[in-house]
Amino acid sequence: MSILTRWLLIPPVNARLIGRYRDYRRHGASAFSATLGCFWMILAWIFIPLEHPRWQRIRAEHKNLYPHINASRPRPLDPVRYLIQTCWLLIGASRKETPKPRRRAFSGLQNIRGRYHQWMNELPERVSHKTQHLDEKKELGHLSAGARRLILGIIVTFSLILALICVTQPFNPLAQFIFLMLLWGVALIVRRMPGRFSALMLIVLSLTVSCRYIWWRYTSTLNWDDPVSLVCGLILLFAETYAWIVLVLGYFQVVWPLNRQPVPLPKDMSLWPSVDIFVPTYNEDLNVVKNTIYASLGIDWPKDKLNIWILDDGGREEFRQFAQNVGVKYIARTTHEHAKAGNINNALKYAKGEFVSIFDCDHVPTRSFLQMTMGWFLKEKQLAMMQTPHHFFSPDPFERNLGRFRKTPNEGTLFYGLVQDGNDMWDATFFCGSCAVIRRKPLDEIGGIAVETVTEDAHTFLRLHRRGYTSAYMRIPQAAGLATESLSAHIGQRIRWARGMVQIFRLDNPLTGKGLKFAQRLCYVNAMFHFLSGIPRLIFLTAPLAFLLFHAYIIYAPALMIALFVLPHMIHASLTNSKIQGKYRHSFWSEIYETVLAWYIAPPTLVALINPHKGKFNVTAKGGLVEEEYVDWVISRPYIFLVLLNLVGVAVGIWRYFYGPPTEMLTVVVSMVWVFYNLIILGGAVAVSVESKQVRRSHRVEMTMPAAIAREDGHLFSCTVQDFSDGGLGIKINGQAQILEGQKVNLLLKRGQQEYVFPAQVARVMGNEVGLKLMPLTTQQHIDFVQCTFARADTWALWQDSYPEDKPLESLLDILKLGFRGYRHLAEFAPSSVKGIFRVLTSLVSWVVSFIPRRPERSETAQPSDQALAQQ
């Protein structure tokens, strides 16, 4: 190249071009790409006035305007990418221009739309104001109770008849389309309304569409003339019926979350009851248990009415010695029957408090735990239990392996953020094994914690609910613990939960027996049905292959009718769940969670349905490390098998599209779309199975807290704590921090009005950010540090509300990226014999995706560039 350019170009231009070529090569471009990049640059110099100020502004904003094109590492077809992205930017810029006369009508529509949104936002307050005078009146108060019940019965009967007509009325394709457009229009109108009315309306619309779909499936879509099609169709219909039941029960469960708030305790502390705190442990490391005990010692409660117990089912001498040193009680069993339930029941023989609070050994309570929860027990004498959320300050395997910690609601956020709050409305909150307070008298009446199943917590409160006792839930995190460290441990925990809930369903079915209210029965059944999702999810992941591979019509209907029934059912359910669950579960993430677990919970739940006494309790490991990133091939094997199976379906589908009957082309397309969606979800499951590094023994917790540090010469620096762990802190100094590098300092933290001092070493300094490593602490200093950090009353309060609202389309894009990431990991970690195949496929997809235009990365300086671009 240098010889050719030396011959064609003058020396200064040649030198600059050679420098550009070397820069391209230094950034990883191939010789061909670098040469071609230089050629495109020469053409740009010839035909484009790059020295013009407008072009200079565009070049300055290259990273914002062309985020997917690396100017330092050119690719052969970059000019095509520039052309596509430029057209995209010009279209976007033209849309933002000031409306011209011919577009005034459109501008008027925008104004109407804005006024409509404002009116909808103000509607709930207006309705509340207009009907305020009716709050203390009954519209039918002058009628007898019997007459009111009769009127209510007539209204309900009329509503049911109308609903039955809406569900069962057959429509031709055009009528079905018009009906769906009407419902969709109403949904779009009400979804922006704040308050619960819009959620209730969306539930009604979703149930109408979903019930029509299920009715249509049962009455019009089974092929009774073909045995293979009939069997495959019935299998899919079974899975769809399960999903429909869970959808209906889920809507019922969360239709009106209670959002219970604390009740103040009496000022006279002599009226406060005595409480025993149980911390059961079996094989966990002492360092995991220490923080829980240290935090329990600092709980704001009269010390003469608070007893802390370590329930050591491992019988370890170091635990006994630790309990003696810190002044808590210690119990070790000689026999170990019934695992955790037996351990707690054994301790109940010795503890004499009026209430018992149970914490898993890694759950660190806040100082306010009892003051926030005990007031309700004094107010309601029939209240047997107050449950609070299980909050985790470390990422679970999904969050860590996908890099989504505190960016996307985790798997448990939906349950503890919404479902238990909904259960509380129906008096169906059940015990979750930790972070709860239980009244001793009702617990003693049923013989302590239930031991017949491996989910003893839920079973215990099913029994108490049958006896007429109530339970409560407060959605304010008052303790935090460690999430499971590996995907295999996470799956093992979920297998135990699934087996236990199915055992309860078989041994103490909430649908039968005395004592439960109808709403309680439904809530318990939904909790148990949730863990039966394994087989239906596997059916959905393989269902389209029945048509592609075996020519079995699983839905015996024209492709147009399938689209007119299936898509509205899915879209309405997604829109409604996004409205209800948006803060607690983002759209499409349930498919990822269920797919990862499906293969593993299907066999144990099936076995538990047949033989509920089979199975054993397994302890979930906490506090482990992951030294190196790796693919868990044992866990991911089922996902890879399903991926290969669906890829076979893709190959057969392509062949059938080109060589099959023309009348089936649309059905093949519908099936292929389903297969590609399944491949995306399976790719996400594969991505989760890539274990990311976890080399910190102490997890960092982000928080903002004022503090100060003192040098050995007594000089004080005010600072703000940004994060902390059991071994150190990250702080931000208000001033120059370089002078502290390598020094020994004292960290000053406050708890209430009292100040505590902790010795520390400055480990790193970056600007005004300082990393502190705690020096060896005495036992009392360690207790004080835990109570100043982990056990602060406000440490976890805002975590549940920190997630962004769900946006279904953006969430779908996240899932697409996640699926592709899974296949890239397969290409990276696959055996050499198949690595080449995966690498070619992922490279091909990456190459195609690289041409898709991107939304500019907006900055304050980007706007002039947009204007310059639009003027070229």
Outline where the language-model segments fall.
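Cell-envelope/extracellular polymer assembly enzymes that use nucleotide-activated donors
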Residues: 274-276, 307, 459
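A conserved acidic beta->alpha catalytic loop
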Residues: 312-319, 335-336
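N-terminal membrane-anchoring/stem segments of glycan-assembly enzymes
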Residues: 2-271, 523, 533-537, 659-689, ...
